[in-house]
């Protein structure tokens, strides 16, 4: 299978995991939430939780590839999306080898004027559980 084909499978796996956890924790959400891109075109954010006004984007990368180069665009997409809150989830083993990418995204998030968080996939379940607890309180 091509590198691109593997990337699509791994990206779909991450999205399925996010969907499973959102469902298990009783979040009501939309998949492939439509908005207008920075270029004025139709675009989709992976998930949107209306109760939290939270847009979620998943990026998975297992090894060398171009996903990391898309992170600046993803951060701009959060600014363009109408949600006040954003969550960027890094899945795959690649991100731990390049911590500067997460640090850059977090720095950009702080400058954005929105509440955007950047987490690794392994922290997702705990993050969602804490968010669910805060929502219930």
Question: Model-predicted segments: where are they?
Answer:
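Catalytic cores of nucleic-acid endonucleases
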Residues: 60-109
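Active-site beta-strand-loop-beta-strand hairpin of nuclease catalytic cores
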Residues: 43-56
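Domain-level recognition of nuclease-like catalytic cores that cleave nucleotide substrates
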Residues: 9, 91-137
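Residues at the starts of beta-strands that form the adenosine-phosphate
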Residues: 28, 52, 85-86
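A generic structural signal for alpha->beta connector loops
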Residues: 26, 83, 113-115
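Hydrophobic/aromatic beta-strand patches that form the interior of the parallel beta-sheet core
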Residues: 56, 87, 117-119
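Alpha-helical scaffolding within the catalytic cores
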Residues: 40-43, 73
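Acidic-basic catalytic patches of nuclease active cores, encompassing PD-(D/E)XK
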Residues: 1-36
């Amino acid at each position: 299978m091509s590198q691109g084909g593997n990337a699509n499978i791994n990206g779909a796996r991450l999205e399925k995991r996010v969907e499973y956890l959102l469902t298990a924790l009783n979040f009501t959400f939309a998949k492939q939430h439509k908005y207008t891109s920075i270029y004025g075109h139709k675009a989709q954010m992976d998930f949107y939780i209306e109760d939290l006004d939270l847009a979620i984007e998943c990026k998975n990368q297992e090894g060398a590839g171009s996903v990391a180069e898309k992170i600046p665009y993803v951060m701009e997409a959060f600014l363009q999306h109408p949600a006040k809150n954003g969550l960027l989830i890094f899945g795959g083993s690649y991100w731990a080898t390049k911590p500067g990418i997460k640090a850059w995204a977090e720095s950009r998030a702080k400058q954005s004027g929105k509440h955007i968080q950047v987490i690794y996939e392994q922290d997702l379940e705990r993050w969602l559980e804490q968010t669910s607890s805060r929502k219930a309180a």
